[in-house]
Amino acid sequence: MTNHYAVIGRPINHTKSPLIHSLFAATTGQDLEYGAIEGSPEDFAGDVQRFRAQGGQGLNVTAPFKLQAFQLATESSERARLARAANTLKFEGEQVLAENFDGIGLLRDIEVNLGQPLAGTRVLLLGAGGAVRGALLPFLAAGPTELVMANRDGRKAAELAQEIGHPLLSVRSYAALEGETFDLVINATSASLVGELPPVPAGVFTQAALAYELAYGKGLTPFLRLAREQGVAQLADGVGMLVEQAAEAFAWWRGVRPETRPVIDQLTLPLT
């Protein structure tokens, strides 16, 4: 029997998820169909219910529905509860189970695919939105010496840090980053989506081994261009994170984790 899954978001025409999951299914021998649903902001719960009624067994969830997906769940993982957002749902009988694989997907891309272990490093996370919330637990568990958040809205970042309450997690204003250096700098702001640069001092890159842009398919964004100008040897966008979180969802649904490297290689565009 063919199993049915989909991604739901708005807009959804840009999504790579059907391609990714079809490649996963082909390489693992799983019999499934995977589609895309343009969700309704006014009736997300109805969209989910209709998909379930048609035999759907799980959903990947993208913007702007991750909070609604979390609220819809009857049971949520610790990662989803911390992020207050779900990027994957699984349906078991009457239960709606919620997970958030964004952070673990990002961590796996950085450590495994890009060869940059977080243990013993100073990490700078730009932003304090859902992507950062989802990354904090996996990142802190990886053993950095310090994890610093910087955000335009300093209060939002401070409240998040207080909520986490971890001794290795701290908050800076962008201005307070002047004179500081980091081993890894990650841009999780929305600035690159509109071709802008977060107001980060150029000096944060001078000792960095990797600059990572969560947006993908945007080429050499202003953030990555500044990092390259400051001598950062390794630049990456978020396509690896996209594929790795998809693999985590696939494994949660199907019980088998697909190989990700061939899919990442197929989807990666040059950073030019």
Kindly label every feature range from the protein language model.
Residues 12-13, 154-155, 218:
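Helix N-cap at the beta1-alpha1 junction of Rossmann-like dinucleotide-binding domains, i.e.
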Residues 22, 26-27, 31-37, 107-125, ...:
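Mobile, glycine- and charge-enriched loop segments
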Residues 62-70, 129-131, 190-193, 217:
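Short glycine-rich anion-binding loops that position phosphate/pyrophosphate groups of nucleotides
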Residues 120, 214-272:
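Adenosine-phosphate binding glycine-rich loop
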Residues 144-164:
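NAD(P)-binding Rossmann-fold cofactor-contacting core
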Residues 166-235, 240:
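Rossmann-like adenosine-cofactor binding region
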